[in-house]
């Protein structure tokens, strides 16, 4: 995984064109699931894998200031910006790839948006995510997915602008989930523009 790409993108990440048609709609749809869960249980422990500049954390903690939120990312520049824009006492960030992250606690909700394609060993990582999730807890994964020739072409160019990635099809993602004992509660396609690849949201329960 080439971390330097994300270090260089950090200072302009919040202004990238993909914010409008991919990242912002993703946060919107994740919050549709996440906010009701927090409303029921304000003490939820949340892990955000690949938290970037902490945009989701900021939007969620604005509604729930006392939320227990941990964000991790491989890029130190991203994490520095996340810390600068999130001042909640229970919102924490750490520079750490998921492969090396050793949690001393389990989480009620684990979120991974637009990071999963960059994990070299996807089966191992989804297993680790499942292990870090509490029994009865939830996992929300969103990523670009290759399910058609159009997706294949768009994702090829997307991969060329970031770092090495593999955009699994929806059936392949479902197979991974099944192997780790995660139950798919909902699959949702985020549709904004015709020239965007399939953005698949998976809402899972352990």
Report the location of each language-model feature.
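A conserved beta-strand element that flanks and buttresses the S-adenosyl-L-methionine
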Residues: 111
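Conserved class I S-adenosyl-L-methionine
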Residues: 1-39, 55, 59, 140-163
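Class I SAM-dependent methyltransferase SAM/SAH-binding core
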Residues: 47, 53-100
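Core SAM-dependent methyltransferase catalytic element
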Residues: 189-206
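A short glycine-rich, Lys/Arg-flanked "PGG" loop and its adjoining helix->strand segment in the class I
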Residues: 123-135
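Short catalytic micro-motifs in class I SAM-dependent methyltransferases
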Residues: 114-115
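Short alpha-helix
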Residues: 165-181
